[in-house]
Amino acid sequence: MIHLLPVAFAALLITTTAGAGDLILTEAGELPVILTAPHGGAEDVPDCAARTPAGKRFVNRPDQRTDLLARGIADELKQLTGKAPYLVMARFHRKFIDANRRADEAYGAPGCAAVYDAYHAAIRRYITEIRSKYPQAMLFDIHGQAAHPDSILRGTHHGTAVARLLARAGATAITGPDSVFGRFAASGYRIVPLNDTVPTDRVEARGYTGGYTVALYGSNHDDGIDAMQLEFGLELRARDVIAQTARDTAQAIAAFYTRYLK
């Protein structure tokens, strides 16, 4: 889809929610799939001071073009399946709010709270809606990383966030041919960890095992769903390949949906 990037930019400009949600793009879907993207935004947050380091791992740069990647995956999924996924995407800059952290680590001023709360309220609302409609569901948290620039990294907190999926379908749902990472590997992508390991073997890359979103909404919680963090290398988000990355990711998710969520 050569038109992917222009369509994505247009959607980011015109499709928003109200109030604090003006800084959050939300779209209800028809698939039992939620795409979240907390780190791709570029907008300032009124009355919210920029974050400052507090002695912990601190990043205030956006995950470049992950907003466009998430948008592209959603559009491609609609093309493939005839149904749209749910989408929650930050438009606010990470230097103000890191929505993939607990509230006490995510921002540094009271004026930021409304936007942070609205982002997570949207995710929770969609999870509640999906759980009322479908027996199984999956959340994919979209991120970017530079440590493995040509690779896609899996983060499930070593299987904890996909506990329900593992219990009903086994490790092949994470590493098998119709798993998302099985499809990535078959398409020629480098993946970390490799699919010759068991998800509970604690082999996910240090620092990329899954953040707050996956930990909070994963299926190890009674009110959660299966959740996985997808970390896309910088090279896979380059302007000349991001459309293909989105297409291949949507195809992988569609295959997973057909096998494990229908």
Language model: regions and residue ranges:
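Sec-dependent signal peptide recognition
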Residues: 1-8
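Alpha-helical transmembrane-bundle signature of multi-pass membrane transport and export proteins
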Residues: 11-13
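N-terminal signal peptide c-region/cleavage motif recognized by signal peptidases
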Residues: 15-17
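N-terminal catalytic or cofactor-binding beta/alpha core of small enzyme domains
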Residues: 19-262
